[in-house]
């Protein structure tokens, strides 16, 4: 009954914000007059609306701003049908529609945050239904994405400030006359030695404690990493330029020494963050590594690894190796069985390595797996298993060997460019096709059946 009352008047609630002269308060007051508060179900809905009104009035003192928010909600008439459908997925989609609409007119996250509380009141009407969990997950996801967006925008701002500082220092360097003591002090006081540290620390925390599990989360993480490397690289260059200028004989050795220590401290911090991230004995990072490796995969990946080299970050040396020519694939669970082609599909039915397969590195850093015969067949993923054919299959025939560790053993996970989140594994009986499964095989019940060793 509560839901019926609510949805009967929900269009009215939305419409109140479409006209510029309307406010959220007047719209909610109009809604309240339609509710029979004497009935138990009506009283529950009335209390929800009163609470919603208090929160909105407290946050949005400007009528025009409130009208914009309500207009964003009111323009999303399709969300009403989704709420009325009773289907959890559609209800969740409706919530997301509303969030996206509001975010399009509210760029200030401090004012955007209460909208989630308001939406939670609406979600509260679904208490005790199967829709509750679905809607809650959407709200949580939206909060995370909005938070990431705000953080990225802040990082872009600091990056711009660093770029201006770098240009300023380049101009100072081009001047041939010596710096006066006053100018040295001005440089040390105004070039942002400390600026951006807070935002760098925020990203560090995000990198350290969030383990991305989905494609969208991983892509957000990679974007964050790219921003982080840009920011840290610029900051390092600024500190280096400033140090070289201030360290000139006759200037201030104390300030120069301090700048050098700040630079060294930053480099050590960056190294620690990335070395922890790239620990290839942590199963929680395997999926993320499958998107990051190989380093030649794309411009973003190359950029990140170039920064690793600049900061002397330690990572698996096998990333620098070319696996072209590898001919034997052995499975950790079945070390005496080797991959070979049979009846147009790849299977672990060979008890002796006949050298019938080989790897060829492609220009994007992935590998093709081919037979060594005169007219070679090309391996490609087909659904959840692998076929050998003469037909080209683009990204499906591009494979990624992700270097990981198992009890100090150097091994590989096998995925494809088309689906980095799917990994190959060998059947328990070591007979039949090589299969792919969503997620890390060892984490979804396949033990060591998803780990491989490669031999030239």
Swiss-Prot record:
Residues spanning the signal sequence: 1-20
Similarity-based family: Belongs to the jellyfish toxin family. Type I subfamily.
Post-translational modifications: Contains disulfide bonds.
Subunit relationships: Oligomer.
Keyword terms, alphabetized: Cardiotoxin, Disulfide bond, Ion transport, Membrane, Nematocyst, Secreted, Signal, Target cell membrane, Target membrane, Toxin, Transmembrane, Transport
Subcellular location: Secreted; Nematocyst; Target cell membrane
Cellular component GO terms, alphabetical: extracellular region; membrane; nematocyst; other organism cell membrane
Covalent S-S links between cysteines: none
Comment field (misc): Negative results: the fraction containing this toxin and CfTX-2 does not cross-react with CfTX-A and CfTX-B antibodies.
Protein name (database record): Toxin CfTX-1
Domain of life: Eukaryota
Any Gene Ontology biological process: monoatomic ion transport
Tissue: Nematocytes.
One GO MF term: toxin activity
Function: May cause profound effects on the cardiovascular system of anesthetized rats (at 25 ug/kg), since the fraction containing this toxin and CfTX-2 produces an initial increase in mean arterial pressure, followed by cardiovascular collapse in all animals within 1 minute of injection. To note, the same fraction does not induce significant change in heart rate. Has weak hemolytic activity. Is lethal to crayfish. Causes cutaneous inflammation in humans. May act as a pore-forming toxin, disrupting normal transmembrane ion concentration gradients in susceptible cells.
Tagged with keyword RNA-binding: no
